[in-house]
């Protein structure tokens, strides 16, 4: 995902410095070229050799290191960087950067960088809330730095409050958002639905389906990484929601209908990947239905057809994509759904096909429009999401 990208990590003197080893490792696994800059104070918390072993690059600490490679090192690295993250960022380094002080390898390099800069403060609560530190952070924001607000919790000093550096996965998400993809969906508003709905029978039982939400979540994350403003309306899943996506949690089909139509008019693209119940119990018991001898029947009634409503009320130049899960006659059934519900495209898959369908991490999609069918091979749901977005981008470009 990050192949060909260069990431600079600036590490300052903080007990949280050890966490950056995990971040450096995660970035390497995504094939980024990772360079680490450390203040001398940071070397008291973690050895530079750790970062050199993880990244395969020399860890830079000393501005006057004689073992240079016939380049002005802080300038040459600054030129190749795609993004800089200073984490953990001490009050000292925040103050230096805010006022243009460049007196070590980290600060001279960061000030020489023209790329996006992200800074993650980490310190005692009283230090973080000090008006001087807050003013310095505002100065950095004014100059284009993105400031990650620290988490709250138990701190190394024994206090409890704001000042904790976020976990490496959160820091990684900020970097991915910045450089993982070309921002070819920037300026687009995209609504994605995902996951199952649950229709209560009584306070204990409900009707649902096997949807994990993985496909919809993959689409939402991919669209966000490509620069879109994404809203995700999601049923209950076991998946961590993607960062930088507005998530609207729902339970029932009625709740999903209301959530979707409340924002549908403002969307450029709607991708309905949720598995919504077609039927719900006509009457929901307020008490647990007791087991009885013999069979039990439950009267069902139709739920609102969200996709049909969206097709009937589609605004001009809005792109509407549905999903179709079939067990037989996949293409003909999906094409009928495309036409009946006034869709621009439908992503069809056969639940019986190996590697496709619910729960798994892969999918096999056929993208169907009025004019053509595009069959995709077995691939990860992340890759399938990007293929889906590529197709939508191509079709919407042709519309314009």
Labelled PLM ranges:
Residues 1-118, 124-213, 217-400:
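A cross-family phosphate/adenosyl-ligand binding-site feature
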């Amino acid at each position: 995902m990050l192949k060909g990208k260069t990431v600079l990590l600036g590490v300052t003197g903080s007990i949280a410095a050890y966490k950056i080893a995990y971040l450096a490792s995660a970035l390497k696994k995504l094939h980024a070229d990772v360079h680490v800059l450390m203040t001398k104070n940071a070397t008291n918390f973690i050895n530079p050799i750790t970062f050199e072993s993880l990244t395969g690059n020399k860890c830079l600490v000393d501005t006057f290191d004689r073992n240079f490679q016939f380049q002005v090192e802080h300038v040459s690295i600054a030129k190749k960087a795609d993004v800089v993250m200073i984490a953990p960022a001490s009050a000292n380094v925040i103050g230096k950067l805010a006022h243009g002080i460049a007196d070590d390898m980290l600060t001279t390099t960061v000030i020489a960088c023209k790329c996006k800069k992200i800074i993650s403060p980490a310190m005692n609560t009283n230090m973080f809330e000090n008006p001087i530190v807050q003013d310095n952070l505002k100065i950095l924001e004014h100059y284009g730095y993105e400031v990650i607000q620290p988490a709250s919790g138990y701190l190394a000093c024994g206090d409890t409050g704001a000042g904790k550096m976020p976990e490496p996965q959160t820091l990684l998400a900020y970097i991915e958002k910045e450089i993982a993809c070309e921002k070819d969906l920037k300026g687009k508003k995209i609504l994605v639905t995902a996951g199952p709905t649950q229709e209560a029978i009584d306070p204990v039982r409900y009707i649902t389906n096997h949807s994990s939400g993985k496909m919809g979540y993959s689409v939402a994350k991919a669209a966000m990484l490509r620069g879109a403003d994404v809203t995700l309306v999601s049923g209950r899943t076991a998946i961590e929601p993607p960062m930088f996506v507005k998530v609207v949690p729902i339970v029932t089909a009625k709740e999903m209908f209301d959530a979707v139509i409340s924002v549908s008019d403002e969307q450029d693209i709607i991708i309905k990947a949720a598995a919504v119940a077609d039927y719900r119990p006509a009457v929901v018991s307020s008490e647990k239905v007791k087991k009885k001898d013999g069979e039990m029947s439950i009267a069902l009634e139709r739920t609102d057809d969200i996709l049909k409503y969206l097709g009937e009320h589609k605004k001009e130049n809005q792109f509407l994509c549905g999903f179709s899960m079939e067990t037989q006659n996949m293409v003909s059934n999906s094409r009928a759904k495309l036409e009946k519900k006034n869709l621009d495209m439908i992503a069809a898959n056969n639940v019986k096909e190996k590697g496709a369908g619910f729960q798994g991490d892969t999918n096999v999609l056929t993208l169907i429009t009025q004019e053509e069918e595009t069959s995709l091979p077995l691939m990860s749901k992340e890759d399938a999401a990007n293929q889906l977005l590529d197709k939508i981008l191509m079709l919407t470009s042709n519309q314009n």
